[in-house]
Amino acid sequence: LIQNINLIDGTGTASRLASVRIMENKISEVGDLQSFEEEEVTDGQGKVLAPGFIDSHSHHYGGLSKNPAGLPATNQGITTIVIGQDGGSYPMDTLESDLKNYPVAINVASYTGHSTLRGKAMGVKSLFRTAKPEELAKMKGYLEQEMKKGSLGLNTGLEYESAFFSNRDLIGSTNFVTSSNVP
């Protein structure tokens, strides 16, 4: 039981003084709670207890191989990072394998990068032109596969060289994402 905490519950309501009971590593009760006989009690000293924060534009992933505790993030209360920004991403299969083989102390979600799709469909040496219709179809197919494997969707970085020549490919990809029935 953690008593005397300033609870922010994530619902948007004002913080409040409360207690939180944890049983079997899960929150079981929240409120004005009294301790059970022989229950371990921690005085929260009025400190804030809040749900973990989500860093929706993170570049921490590369450092997690050297620091799986993710201390730069977890020390800030971040429990989930979202990667795949700026148009670049790892394939979902690679990401899943990496996280299975090298577990980290933080949740990781990913977008699929637009420039990554362009590179896979067009070849890295061909990025300095607009995509051909058959390459656009490949990009949509790759994006659909990645979303079925857990990608959050499409992310761009149009200010980066690999995306300078995108035009229809970006529009086509965003149309797919918005009309997609991928869960």
Enumerate the predicted regions with their spans:
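Conserved N-terminal strand/loop that marks the beginning of ABC ATPase nucleotide-binding domains
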Residues: 1-5
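Histidine-rich, glycine-flanked metal-binding segment
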Residues: 7-52
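Flexible loop residues that form catalytic
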Residues: 10, 86, 159
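Short secondary-structure boundary/hinge segments and terminal tails
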Residues: 38, 91-92, 164-165
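Divalent-metal coordination cores built from histidine and acidic residues
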Residues: 44-49, 53, 58, 66-156, ...
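Active-site-adjacent substrate/metal-binding segments within catalytic domains
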Residues: 62
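Active-site core of metal-dependent hydrolases
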Residues: 154-183
